[in-house]
């Protein structure tokens, strides 16, 4: 007749998966009940792995059959499966009311020019505005804001930087932290850390809007910013040519995937009016954006002409909204700032800015 000792000896042959000790030595056998060749076993293991339980169930059942057990009630208790942590909103710049990402699928479309003039136009609406140059590989903001020769200022603790001021806008750029013309040869993690530091280690103070001039593309920098602060708006800058619109679509798709409210598209250099003959020429073509607008439920936030004064103002550090406030482009930037402000009010009212759903998550589980 089968005894509890026989059962226990048989269980000593059952090795716990991925270890060298048996389940009896581990103390996993909690109860044995034996009545008329009907066996009940209670096994408690520290793993929630279904594979581990299945291996033990198969090996124990086989060992008990060899002992002549006709009816086996095998209960293998496991700890509850670890729950994935609930995503939470991350915000490295809680004193900033709205963060606006100025993006483009490719370089050379006027993204920095848009960032500079939009920031000043917002400041002219009596808003507290910051301008962050996150294009660490090609920082043009210092020159465009007339700050290329300025020295950075540390706070009294010597641990944080104070933004520089130009045209009523608080400004910070990696271009202020290293010599002009010096290249940065950084891998992704260094870039990501730099962007986080420009949010957390800069004393921005209380801002209504922080405009962030991003590097071209849809990579580490964009994802890092989106995960670091809730973004209130994404704006993509493009020219009308087809290859630029193709890249603009990628930028809009990034906004959608990162849950960034899309404020609109800036069509830059759409046309050129000759100062002498007044003839208007569409240098980059006149391709329709209706498909993009419909696909991403957005609007054309501004249509800017190719105006030589814009380029000249950028080179001299005198943005056109300052140097020629009555020009066509300056008036467009002025209207753009008002339209963006209305959009940001809507985002705040409807609580659309949140980055909890794009935070990286990692579940730690005991799997043996």
Swiss-Prot record:
InterPro entries: FSCA_dom_sf, MIP18-like, Mrp-like_CS, Mrp/NBP35_ATP-bd, NUBPL-like, P-loop_NTPase, YlxH/NBP35. Pfam families: FeS_assembly_P, ParA. The keyword Metal-binding applies. The keyword Iron-sulfur applies. Binds and transfers iron-sulfur (Fe-S) clusters to target apoproteins. Can hydrolyze ATP. One of its GO terms (biological process) is iron-sulfur cluster assembly. Signal peptide: none annotated. PANTHER family: IRON-SULFUR PROTEIN NUBPL. In the N-terminal section; belongs to the MIP18 family. HAMAP family: Mrp_NBP35. Keywords: ATP-binding, Hydrolase, Iron, Iron-sulfur, Metal-binding, Nucleotide-binding. This is Iron-sulfur cluster carrier protein. GO terms for molecular function: 4 iron, 4 sulfur cluster binding; ATP binding; ATP hydrolysis activity; ATP-dependent FeS chaperone activity; metal ion binding. Homodimer. SUPFAM superfamilies: Fe-S cluster assembly (FSCA) domain-like, P-loop containing nucleoside triphosphate hydrolases. ATP binds at residues 105-112. The gene is mrp.
């Amino acid at each position: 007749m089968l005894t509890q000792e026989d059962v226990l000896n048989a269980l000593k042959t059952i090795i716990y998966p991925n270890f060298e000790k048996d389940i009896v030595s581990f103390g996993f056998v909690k109860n044995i009940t034996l009545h008329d060749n009907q066996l009940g076993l209670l096994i408690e293991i520290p793993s929630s792995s279904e594979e581990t339980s299945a291996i033990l169930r198969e090996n124990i059942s086989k060992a008990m059959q060899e002992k002549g057990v006709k009816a086996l009630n095998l209960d293998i208790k496991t700890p509850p499966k670890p729950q994935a942590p609930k995503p939470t909103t991350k915000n490295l710049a809680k004193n900033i009311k709205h963060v606006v990402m100025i993006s483009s699928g490719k370089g050379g479309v006027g993204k920095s020019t848009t960032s500079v003039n939009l920031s000043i136009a917002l400041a002219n609406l009596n808003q507290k505005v910051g301008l962050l140059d996150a294009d660490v590989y090609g920082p043009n903001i210092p020159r465009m804001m007339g700050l290329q020769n300025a020295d950075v200022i540390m706070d009294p603790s010597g641990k944080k930087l104070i933004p520089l001021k130009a045209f009523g806008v608080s400004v910070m750029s990696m271009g202020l932290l290293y010599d002009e013309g010096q290249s940065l040869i950084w891998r992704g993690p260094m870039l990501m850390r730099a962007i986080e530091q420009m949010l957390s280690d800069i004393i921005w103070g209380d801002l209504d809007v922080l405009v962030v001039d991003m590097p071209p593309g849809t990579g580490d920098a964009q994802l890092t910013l989106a995960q670091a602060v809730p973004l209130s708006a994404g704006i993509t800058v493009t020219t009308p040519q087809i290859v630029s619109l193709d890249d603009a679509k990628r930028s809009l798709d990034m906004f959608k995937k990162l849950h960034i409210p899309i404020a609109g598209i800036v069509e830059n250099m759409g046309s050129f009016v000759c100062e002498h003959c007044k003839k208007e020429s569409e240098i980059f073509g006149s391709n329709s954006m209706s498909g993009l607008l419909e696909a991403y439920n957005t609007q054309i936030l501004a249509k800017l002409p190719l105006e030589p004064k814009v380029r000249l103002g950028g080179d001299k550090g005198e943005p056109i909204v300052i140097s020629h406030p009555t020009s066509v482009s300056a008036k467009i930037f002025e209207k753009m700032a008002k339209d963006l402000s209305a959009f940001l009010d809507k985002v705040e009212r409807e609580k659309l800015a949140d980055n909890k759903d794009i935070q990286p998550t990692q579940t730690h589980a005991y799997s043996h």
